[in-house]
Design a protein with these regions (language model features):
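Intrinsically disordered, low-complexity terminal regions
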Residues: 1-360
Length: 360
């Protein structure tokens, strides 16, 4: 192909692209945008409470050193006509007030007939709030995200549905309900978590935690004590001192257990403990079609009781087994290095497996 032909083809391609882009722009309906902003400030003391209830947008909080809560709400509507966009703006009602010791920001939507163009109307309602870091908060957000600062020093109650929570640490108690979103928070002192259908839940260090986790995957770094009910979701804890759990239809992995672990039900699940420290007190697991895998330092002194193992597998390997016995063909007992300290109690309910191996 000579240079003249190549140039002609390039010009032809450019013409086609111009025609196509023009056709698209002619076919696209113009979009009208309407905006509204509401702002209000309130003097507060540290015994006051901030309460919000928003939807179809985000709630973003920042901290400052003033004894004041400043709330700014941005509403934006997009529609095929200016009248439709304005009608959408008019549908939104924002109530900002202080009553007693509670500063509140509440979103409500008036009922409105949109005709046949409902699918072409879009709007967002975003809260931007500045407040003292030690103020207590009660936040509710649907169809949007909650964004909090790095350090939150007031008691916190948070509900987020169909959106994400992004936050730093909580030095006071945290009560969280999260559904159909992701959760990313840093360290907590005391937390109660109600989680459902969350894609990923990430928590830093936790001193004490109660968690009801369903259809969600949760990752925790270091945890002092946890009370956990986990169903249809995987859980990973890097380090745990003490735990009380129910694990169903899940995969659970704990990097290390320092003190004790009690699992009232390990059902159709696998629990793996990568390191049970040498001075552990006890591990109690009641399994139903479950698998327990534990690694313990080879020089640790402890006992193992694996009971109701009729159709189950058991493996104890790599240790100095100083004594072992079997009762009724289904109950098996081991003493490791004299069996002087901790104890592993496993009820296999006939169909569950246990594997205990030595860490060199």
């Amino acid at each position: 192909m000579n240079t003249k032909q190549l140039k002609s083809r390039s010009l032809l391609l450019l013409a086609v692209l111009l025609i196509a882009s023009t056709a698209i722009s002619w076919g696209a309906k113009p979009e009208s945008i309407k905006k509204k902003e509401i702002s209000k400030s309130f003097d507060v003391s540290l015994s006051d409470l901030l309460m919000t209830d928003n939807r179809y947008g985000n709630t973003t909080i920042t901290h400052w050193n003033k004894n004041e809560v400043a709330i700014r709400v941005e509403i934006e509507a997009k529609a095929e006509s200016a009248d439709a966009a304005q009608a959408c703006i008019d549908r939104v009602n924002i109530e900002l007030k202080k009553s007693g010791n509670t500063v509140s920001a509440i979103t409500s939507l008036k009922q409105q007939n949109w005709g046949n163009n409902n699918s072409n109307i879009r709007f967002t309602i975003n809260y931007f709030i500045s407040m003292p870091s030690k103020l207590a908060i009660n936040l509710s957000q649907k169809y949007g995200n909650i964004n909090l600062p790095d350090k939150n020093e007031g008691k916190s109650t948070i509900q987020v549905k169909y959106g994400n929570l992004n936050a730093g640490s909580f030095t006071q108690p945290l009560n969280l309900e999260a559904k159909y979103g992701n959760v990313d928070i840093n360290n907590v002192t005391k937390a109660n978590l109600d989680l459902g259908y969350c894609g990923n839940v990430s928590v830093g260090d936790a001193e004490q935690m109660n968690a009801d986790n369903k259809y969600s995957n949760m990752n925790i770094k270091k945890c002092g004590q946890i009370n956990l009910e986990n169903k249809y979701g995987n859980i990973k804890i890097e380090s745990l001192d003490k735990g009380y759990m129910e694990i169903k239809y899940s995969e659970a992995m704990i990097g290390s257990v320092k003190d004790e672990l009690n699992v009232d039900e390990l059902a159709y699940s696998t629990l793996t403990i990568k390191e049970l420290t040498a001075n552990f007190k006890q591990v109690n697991v009641d399994a139903r079609y479950g698998n327990l895998n534990i690694s313990v330092p080879a020089k640790a002194s402890f006992k193992i009781a694996a009971e109701n193992m009729k159709y189950a597998n058991r493996h104890v390997s790599g240790f100095n087994i100083t004594n072992s016995s079997t009762e009724d063909k289904v109950n098996h007992y081991y003493e490791i290095n004299g069996g002087n300290k901790g104890r592993i109690n496993f009820d296999g309910n006939n169909y569950s497996n246990i594997n205990v191996k030595a860490l060199k």
